Amino acid sequence: MNGVHDMGGLQCFGPVHPEPHEPLFHAPWERHAMALTVAMGATGQWNIDQMRSARESLPPAQYLGMSYYQIWLKALQDMMVSRQLVTAHECREGQMSTPPVAGVRTLTRDAVDAALKRGSPAVRETSSQPVFTLGQRVRARLMHPSGHTRLPRYVRGHVGTIHLIQGFHVCPDISSRHRHQAPGPEADVGQWLYGVRFEGAELWGPQ
């Protein structure tokens, strides 16, 4: 989608000032926000690309007014409500007022280390061959999807060169669809993944 999360090339937002020696977390609550996101992701009620889509779908003013983990937490709440795991009232009050949903997979304390080490690999097996070859010139699709995409807006329609063939992976643009329902079989559809190099002048002009 063409949202404020895709800020590459946008003007009027000022320079980026990297924080020297930036900590992983700026406040204790951010640790909890990440832990909640990981724990709820283990329920299997959504996948990582659906969660990214939820973050990107926040209203622009709200998105721009939030910190990184505030965005994570708000999107997590929205996903939990959409799956009827909690109610909006429970999110506001911080107290459970309805019985827990039965049959939902949970991440127990003793399984956390193994789950984090295992991760969520996106590589899939295939008998097909890559469509493109190293050094081949390709043009990025000129498109304006309503959902999540990993193709930045500023490269769409531009010509680049294949410099990496990175394997056969789940396609985020496909697996993020239908974010208001649990992932179906189509979420596991794979495509070849390429690294494409674009020249600066191709993207931004001679300046």
Where are these regions (language model features)?
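N-terminal intrinsically disordered, low-complexity, charge/repeat-rich segments that act as generic
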Residues: M1-V101
